[in-house]
C-alpha cells in the first residue's frame, strides 16, 4: 500500500490524471482503487497518449511515452534475478528514462552491471539513476509508529522461490517450520513472497504447507498484501538474501 500513498501524493498535483494498471500479483491492493484496470504486462506497449509511465515492477514492454520511470524497491545491492536472466533485465532497464534508487550503493551496483553489459553490444540511451532515498522505509516507519503489536513471534519471509535456487530458503521451509514449532514457544508467521502466491504451481505448495500446519495454534501463513502486521508482531526475522531483511531492520 506504500505505492498507493505515492499515487495519492501525485494526485494532489493540478492537471494530472492518474490511471492504475494491475496484474494478478497486485490485484488485491489495487483493484478496488478508483480508475484502475487489469492488464497483462505484455500489452503495455499498446497504451498510447500518456505523459508518464511509473512502475515498481520491472517490465519488458513499455507504453509509448517520453517519461518511463522505474522505482526499485531494494535498499541494498540484493540480487534481482538469476545470472542467466541478468542481460535481459539490464536491457529492459535501459529502456527507462529514469530509475529511482534508494542509495549510492545501489546506484553504483546498477551502473556496474549496465557498463558490463554495454560491452556486450547492448546499446541504448542510458537512463538517469536518481537517489531518492528509501521511499518504502518512510512508509513503514510512519505505519509502525501508529500501533505496536509485538508478540512472541518469528517471521519467516524468504525471497522469490525461483530466484537463485541454490541460495534461497525454498527447499528448507517445511523442515524449518517444523523445527521451530516443535522446539520453541514462539508463534511462527510464514510470509511467502508475493510472487510465489501469484504462481499457480507454487500456490499449490503454499496451500499444502498451510494445510499441514493450520491446526497448530502457533502457526499462521500470511498472504496479506501488506507485510506491516507481520513486522509488528514478530521479534525475530528469518530470511535469505531478500531485501526484506533491511526493511525489517
What positions do the PLM features span?
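Short acidic, S/G/P-rich loop/turn micro-motifs used as interaction or catalytic elements
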Residues: 1-2, 27, 60-61, 75-77, ...
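Active-site and donor-binding regions of nucleotide-sugar-utilizing enzymes
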Residues: 1-141
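Conserved catalytic-core segment of nucleotide-activated headgroup transferases in glycan assembly
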Residues: 2-10, 135-208
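Catalytic donor nucleotide-activated moiety binding site of glycosyltransferases and closely related
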Residues: 17-33, 181-223
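Short His-Asn-centered micro-motif
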Residues: 22, 54-57, 71-72, 102-103, ...
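Short, flexible loop segments at the rims of nucleotide/cofactor-binding pockets, characterized by
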Residues: 30-36, 75-82, 164-167, 214-220, ...
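Short, surface-exposed amphipathic charged segments that create phosphate/polyanion-binding patches used
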Residues: 50-58, 142-155, 230, 235-239
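A donor-sugar binding/catalytic signature common to diverse glycosyltransferases
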Residues: 58-72, 79, 224-249
Amino acid at each position: 500500500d506504500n505505492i498507493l500513498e505515492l499515487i495519492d501524493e501525485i494526485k494532489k498535483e493540478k492537471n494530472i490524471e492518474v490511471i492504475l494498471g494491475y496484474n494478478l500479483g497486485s490485484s488485491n491492493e489495487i483493484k478496488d482503487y478508483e480508475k484502475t484496470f487489469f492488464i497483462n504486462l505484455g500489452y503495455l506497449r499498446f497504451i498510447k497518449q500518456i505523459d508518464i509511465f511509473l512502475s515498481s515492477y520491472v517490465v519488458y514492454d513499455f507504453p509509448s511515452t517520453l517519461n518511463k520511470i522505474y522505482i526499485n524497491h531494494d535498499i541494498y545491492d540484493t540480487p534481482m534475478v538469476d545470472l542467466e536472466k541478468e542481460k535481459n533485465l539490464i536491457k529492459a532497464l535501459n529502456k527507462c528514462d529514469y530509475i529511482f534508487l534508494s542509495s549510492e550503493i545501489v546506484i553504483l551496483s546498477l551502473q556496474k552491471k549496465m557498463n558490463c553489459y554495454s560491452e556486450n553490444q547492448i546499446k541504448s540511451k542510458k537512463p538517469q539513476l536518481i537517489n531518492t532515498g528509501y521511499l518504502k522505509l518512510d512508509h513503514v516507519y510512519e505505519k509502525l509508529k501508529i500501533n505496536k503489536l509485538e508478540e512472541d513471534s518469528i517471521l519467516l519471509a524468504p525471497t522469490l522461490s525461483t530466484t537463485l535456487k541454490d541460495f534461497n530458503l525454498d527447499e528448507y521451509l517445511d523442515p524449518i517450520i517444523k523445527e521451530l514449532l516443535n522446539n520453541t514457544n514462539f508463534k511462527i508467521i510464514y510470509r511467502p513472497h508475493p510472487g510465489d502466491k501469484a504462481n499457480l504451481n507454487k500456490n499449490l505448495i503454499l496451500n499444502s504447507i498451510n494445510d499441514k500446519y493450520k491446526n497448530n495454534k502457533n502457526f499462521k501463513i500470511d498472504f496479506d498484501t501488506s507485510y506491516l502486521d507481520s513486522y509488528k508482531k514478530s521479534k525475530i526475522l528469518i530470511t535469505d538474501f531478500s531485501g526484506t531483511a533491511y526493511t525489517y531492520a
